[in-house]
Amino acid sequence: MSKIDIQDNFLNPNYFKNLKNLFLSERVNWTYSDVISYENELSATKIDNFQFTHMVYFDDAPVSPHYNDLIDFINEIKVASTCKIKVNMNPKTDKIIVHGFHNDMVYKCKTGILYLNNNNGYTIFEDGTKVESIENRFVSFDSGMKHSGTSCTDQRVRLVININYFEPELHK
């Protein structure tokens, strides 16, 4: 099994609070996304398979006015090159919905998730490993590991920042 790295209290508390407040504010425009998992077999029914997204970085360029707000986050990860940054907002549901296992990227890189709020949703991996949604927790793993996000039932939304990136090469 590939390694899943979990780091709690990942960002400076004041910076994290500002980031969380930004993405919970009306200053951010959200896009409705009809499909969460790109696999043919979904755990969620079609009616439950949606989320709201805010693309921050895509196709080798910032695509959001909020990209600069994430610079300290990117630097904390020690990113050599960014592939994609997207903020996902999953609305509350009556029961936890597992949206379907997927890989974010088709090539080998790292996937990272920063949890912006506490809720009873989670990230689950194909091997059954669950990572709870705890605010200011950062989880990273090889992009080849299939995973799924969920909805939550105890908060209005489940909010995460998803980043796909290349790590710097280690020099001896």
What is each model feature region?
Residues 112-114, 155-171:
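A short hydrophobic beta-strand segment most commonly corresponding to one strand
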Residues 1, 27, 124, 163-172:
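Double-stranded beta-helix
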Residues 100-101, 146-154:
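Short beta-strand His + acidic residue motifs that chelate non-heme Fe in jelly-roll/DSBH
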Residues 67-72, 78-103, 107-111:
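Internal catalytic-core helix/loop-beta-alpha segment
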Residues 1-80:
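Non-heme Fe(II)/2-oxoglutarate
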Residues 95-100, 107-109, 115-134:
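A short beta-strand-loop-beta hairpin characteristic of the jelly-roll/cupin
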Residues 131-148:
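Conserved metal-binding segment of the jelly-roll/cupin
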